[in-house]
From Swiss-Prot:
Active site feature: 1286 (glycyl thioester intermediate)
The protein, known as: E3 ubiquitin-protein ligase NEDD4
Pathway named in the protein's UniProt entry: Protein modification; protein ubiquitination
Bias (Polar residues) ranges: 207-229, 796-809
Highest classification ranks of the organism: Eukaryota, Metazoa, Chordata, Craniata, Vertebrata
Organism name: Homo sapiens (Human)
Amino acid sequence: MAQSLRLHFAARRSNTYPLSETSGDDLDSHVHMCFKRPTRISTSNVVQMKLTPRQTALAPLIKENVQSQERSSVPSSENVNKKSSCLQISLQPTRYSGYLQSSNVLADSDDASFTCILKDGIYSSAVVDNELNAVNDGHLVSSPAICSGSLSNFSTSDNGSYSSNGSDFGSCASITSGGSYTNSVISDSSSYTFPPSDDTFLGGNLPSDSTSNRSVPNRNTTPCEIFSRSTSTDPFVQDDLEHGLEIMKLPVSRNTKIPLKRYSSLVIFPRSPSTTRPTSPTSLCTLLSKGSYQTSHQFIISPSEIAHNEDGTSAKGFLSTAVNGLRLSKTICTPGEVRDIRPLHRKGSLQKKIVLSNNTPRQTVCEKSSEGYSCVSVHFTQRKAATLDCETTNGDCKPEMSEIKLNSDSEYIKLMHRTSACLPSSQNVDCQININGELERPHSQMNKNHGILRRSISLGGAYPNISCLSSLKHNCSKGGPSQLLIKFASGNEGKVDNLSRDSNRDCTNELSNSCKTRDDFLGQVDVPLYPLPTENPRLERPYTFKDFVLHPRSHKSRVKGYLRLKMTYLPKTSGSEDDNAEQAEELEPGWVVLDQPDAACHLQQQQEPSPLPPGWEERQDILGRTYYVNHESRRTQWKRPTPQDNLTDAENGNIQLQAQRAFTTRRQISEETESVDNRESSENWEIIREDEATMYSNQAFPSPPPSSNLDVPTHLAEELNARLTIFGNSAVSQPASSSNHSSRRGSLQAYTFEEQPTLPVLLPTSSGLPPGWEEKQDERGRSYYVDHNSRTTTWTKPTVQATVETSQLTSSQSSAGPQSQASTSDSGQQVTQPSEIEQGFLPKGWEVRHAPNGRPFFIDHNTKTTTWEDPRLKIPAHLRGKTSLDTSNDLGPLPPGWEERTHTDGRIFYINHNIKRTQWEDPRLENVAITGPAVPYSRDYKRKYEFFRRKLKKQNDIPNKFEMKLRRATVLEDSYRRIMGVKRADFLKARLWIEFDGEKGLDYGGVAREWFFLISKEMFNPYYGLFEYSATDNYTLQINPNSGLCNEDHLSYFKFIGRVAGMAVYHGKLLDGFFIRPFYKMMLHKPITLHDMESVDSEYYNSLRWILENDPTELDLRFIIDEELFGQTHQHELKNGGSEIVVTNKNKKEYIYLVIQWRFVNRIQKQMAAFKEGFFELIPQDLIKIFDENELELLMCGLGDVDVNDWREHTKYKNGYSANHQVIQWFWKAVLMMDSEKRIRLLQFVTGTSRVPMNGFAELYGSNGPQSFTVEQWGTPEKLPRAHTCFNRLDLPPYESFEELWDKLQMAIENTQGFDGVD
């Protein structure tokens, strides 16, 4: 991740011209701020950012003659910053009045000082050498003194604000605007005391030479008056900039490596949010002595020395001036701690005054202005007592007095952004203004220490010809200070330079009465950092902003509005070796930089991307992911297109054909039963090779008993294991046969070997009859017997012994081929001899037979049905391996009071008349002492589907066919008009007859299937805005909650899509669209749980899971939720009055439920209702409920052929598993033994969808992008496998046998809702 984070504030931005990359004078007129995140890492999760837009009144003018000289140093210390994943931004505003006049100030960053250019009418004072200019004719003369040991200066803002700065082994800076007044004095060894007096105001810096240590006797110390003449109350205009400017400089560091970018004023507070409610801004009581408050316009500077002031006398002075009722908290700050400062509003007119004295320990500030406004306060101290060096007349020191009058008629300046900072690493002592207007010093001792500037301050506003830049730099490893760089760029630099040479200018400044303001909390936002893009410096930055809803700090806060930000990561550049060394030094021990890009990655990242081909557009979805839209073909893709990749029509057709081929391979599970009426007809049997027949003949016996030549399970298990080990990776995948008679047929498509001679054919055999014999009944009900061996019939029941010899003879004759007689004889014995053994393991009423090609199938005489699936797989492994059980597998009679019945869909269930309850499990299997645990209910999707097809009856009062004539170029629009034009939806149940314009042909099913493919690609295309890709991948869909903004008739289109989906299900066709799991649950009217969110949005899921498992009270969450729409964030209440309800342990489950309902149900309720209205017009709602959400996906989208070779090749193993591990070998053996349905169900269990990407498992997606299928060792053999759908990971315990793995895996797949198997 890039180390620099760029934040842009869009406060009425008018120009967006790029800035120079070097710090100079060529600044634009906008607000900028750069915060460089340090590589020094801690363990915090929140970085608090405060933005404080302020405004104060425009001050009138005061003239003075000064001469400026200054020097200053800012000590440095090590900054310790915290690692963050979220920015918490707090806003602190002030009431605004007036507007900012056009004025410009220019500063040179190369000069080690802060330059402030003043105009006529703006007060400025500087430093003179050991002299104090007198006041003549009522004009103000400021006389600060400065020598080698003490430095100070005064700086003013561009609109009449007054600030001062002086430092020597202690730094102080104070900046205000709009007439607000602050004063700061820092001295190396001087101390000042001021006697109380009325109508006095400190108007200048009073430092002294630290080496002279002079003192002024009390008899010579008279108040220094500073008179103000209201000579002009005219507004401050732009023309005044052209003459009468004063330059003052504040020292800054030269070593700043951050280029000038477009930023705004921000301050980062690396501390947790406030837990103590701040005092009311209108309260007259004092602040608490301790507590953590959100700051408001405050600098804290570490004290040089804490003074004792207990007995009313002071040996060491402390001075801080506040204006208009600004109250400073009396407290001692810990490093990084910031106190709250609020303006004190009082009635009546107070006059500001500061009383100076030599023998009093108190410094007082009284205010008598009825119009108060807040300002910046600087906390600092002085160390030793020193005398005031001033110019005297006739041996007397006559400091002047000044009375400042406030005029409420003056014009004001509006400052849009304002920052504050915290600095000290030692204890700080603040002054507090009591209700009498006195500034009291705390009774604490100040320790000697350097003042450290730890953050930067800047003023800015989005106004013409004014810009402000604040650059914040961290030098953690070398202990360097944060650097302050404030620049005011004027539109006419030449005139400024000429005027800056004149150091003696007369300035007049009038302070007027300002209206009452209050400094209140605007709100705070949490900004996620993970989806932020990285900026390319070679390209023009797209100024796309996001609006974040302002949240309250506590339940008593009332906030409203948005914070608009544009944030990007600054790209890493190939910096010097010193920069890399600094980054290495700044890392704390124990931290390692991961995913460090190499030089090639750097070069690739810095390469300028090629322009998009014509007709392409770059966009971003709601998750910040970039995708590209092809307006010519109306397609979207994730990969950036290039002119070389611009596909021709033929290549596009090939891709379309490939997608269609993948779609056509999907099928319904019982398609073969719909077209085949006579199963026993010889021409309907499928030709199958020996390897397939061998694999399926007795797959239920993987656990071999002791060696026996007639043991079929032993031979099959050994052969299957050998093939998995030897030929598993080299087998060639072949397409499935066009005659899909069995769902199990697709499971062997990945393994094709050399043709082998077929096994001896064992013809259909009835139970209790010799092989090849079958019992049938004639029309009168008489039984007769058919000998398929000789193709004869007889009324006499044949004996078993006579037919065994015939079977052996037939087997040896039919096995003639390249194999030896010995192997032929063995093969014949393997098939013919264990007939009773095979049937002995079958359940009661079942029989196994073989097709002419040797493929076994099973007959259930209880229900008179046949199946390719071995029913023995449904018996627990420990039962299958026990030969001591009865050969008929008869578990005995049912317990007393029980009854066995068959459901309407063919499933067997049991009735307990004792307690009047029903269940699917056989009660005889509940006797653990005899048979072990009960067999869980297995969802038989095939039976459900067949029952569903039987219930769908065609109505008689509809036409024979439903015709549609369409154009391929406008298939969506033509289909919409034709289908929605049908008033009676039953007409859509007629046979489909589709013709494409300009094409001749008869539609006997193939054209309709192609139409469903084409219409699916159009309906579910995110280009039209009706659907969008889910958060986890780019092939599962969800309804776009903002579809109404893309299409006014979106509800009509959703009804159309519902009708098309119903037509596909009714006619047995498929849709090429896969939805998220909550979509299918909503169709079935099932409740959506927290587990369903994991596969859709893992970040959201983890947040809600944390709330469920922890106490959310400290998060200060409300029953509200934010939604982003086109860059703006909107706020929705989850319940009435939700913004006032705090989420606690008692109501957190309700909160999670409401969040899930809003996320999946409420936002798309209208769209989903329209879709279900169209769907249920063709499919009965009660009939569809026999399926679960996974089976409903198979019903709508069909079963696909899973390439096991590709699946296995792109699977990863973790935590001790490897490709050669025994459990992994058993796992893939189980996958091979599964039919297509079971494989799809396994895929759904692990990944959440039955669809495999077009290019195979290599492009399988997870919640964080491409994520391969993973099998990880976890748990103990007693546990069931579990899945993580967001990571495509299967947690597989190390089972001790294949039978145990098979049982547990089947149970997990079939009963995912019955246990916590997916998390």
